[in-house]
Regions:
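DNA-recognition alpha helix
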Residues: 31-60
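Short intrinsically disordered terminal tails
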Residues: 1-5, 99-102
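Short Lys/Arg-rich cationic patches that frequently serve as NLS/NoLS or arginine-rich RNA/DNA-binding motifs
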Residues: 2-5, 70-74, 89
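Positively charged, polyanion-binding regions of nucleic-acid-associated proteins
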Residues: 2-34, 38, 42
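Major-groove recognition helix of helix-turn-helix-like DNA-binding domains
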Residues: 52-81
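Short Lys/Arg-enriched helix C-cap and helix-to-coil transition segments
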Residues: 81-98
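Short, flexible helical or helix-coil boundary motifs
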Residues: 25-26, 43-47, 76, 80-83, ...
Length: 102
């Protein structure tokens, strides 16, 4: 029970940080790398952190994974049109074409 509550709290915090990044950094709306760096900065991470240190902190659950941040971006952009970047409509149109070809 306690672990579930901790995970829910962590997810809520990640979601808020992704939302903050999307509202304050227009480039983050179309570029997941920019978004992830912005979120990591909110956790107090340096931009010249070693990759091994980053991976260790992600595996320990101290930092969110890149996939988690991307999922939150997709969710937030789906439910809030103001957070969508210039590429959002292009991605949706392409996804529609791919679905039809399958």
């Amino acid at each position: 029970m306690k672990t579930t509550m901790n995970n829910e709290m962590k997810n809520m915090i990640v979601g808020k940080r992704v939302y903050y990044a999307l509202t304050n950094n227009v480039k983050a709306r179309d570029d997941d790398s920019v978004l992830y760096i912005d979120v990591l900065k909110q956790y107090g991470c340096s931009t010249n952190m070693r990759a091994t240190t980053l991976e260790k902190r992600v595996s320990e659950g101290v930092l969110p994974s890149r996939d988690t941040v991307t999922r939150y971006r997709r969710y937030l952009q789906r439910v809030d049109e103001t957070l969508r970047g210039t590429l959002w409509n292009k991605r949706q149109a392409y996804a529609s074409v791919v679905r039809k070809s399958i």
